[in-house]
């Protein structure tokens, strides 16, 4: 039987002769649209909606914008409605 000592390997990794420190992950910030005094998600507010659209015109995912799932669905629907009503372009111009 092979015995392995994984307890010391889990805490630190050896890189060459030096030992690397533990990797700490950044704490995710909360939803920017769920804080008090946050702007209301509405298709009639293209200034807000354009912040959640990429340069190519695609909707940004919630892992990039840090928006919660409920607000992400509202954002997606508002962006789609704004595009249909010609408040937002479907495709942005390449510069």
UniProtKB/Swiss-Prot annotation:
Kinase keyword on record: no
SUPFAM superfamilies given in the database record: Ribosomal protein S18
Gene Ontology CC: cytosolic small ribosomal subunit
GO molecular function: small ribosomal subunit rRNA binding; structural constituent of ribosome
Matches recorded under Pfam families: Ribosomal_S18
Alphabetical list of Gene3D superfamilies matching this protein: Ribosomal protein S18
Coiled coil region boundaries: none
Entries under InterPro entries matching the protein: Ribosomal_bS18 (IPR001648), Ribosomal_bS18_CS (IPR018275), Ribosomal_bS18_sf (IPR036870)
GO biological process: translation
Key words of the record: Ribonucleoprotein, Ribosomal protein, RNA-binding, rRNA-binding
Signal peptide (residue range): none
Subunit organization: Part of the 30S ribosomal subunit. Forms a tight heterodimer with protein bS6.
Its job: Binds as a heterodimer with protein bS6 to the central domain of the 16S rRNA, where it helps stabilize the platform of the 30S subunit.
Family membership: Belongs to the bacterial ribosomal protein bS18 family.
The name this protein goes by in its record: Small ribosomal subunit protein bS18
Biological source species: Rickettsia canadensis (strain McKiel)
């Amino acid at each position: 039987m092979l015995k392995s000592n994984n307890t010391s390997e889990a805490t630190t990794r050896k890189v060459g002769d030096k030992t690397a420190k533990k990797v700490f992950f950044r704490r995710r910030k909360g939803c920017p649209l769920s804080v008090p005094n946050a702007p209301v998600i509405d298709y009639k507010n293209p200034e807000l909606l354009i912040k959640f659209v990429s340069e190519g015109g695609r909707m940004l995912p919630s892992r990039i914008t840090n928006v919660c799932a409920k607000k992400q669905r509202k954002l997606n629907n508002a962006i789609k409605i704004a595009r249909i009503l010609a408040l937002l372009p479907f495709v942005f111009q390449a510069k």
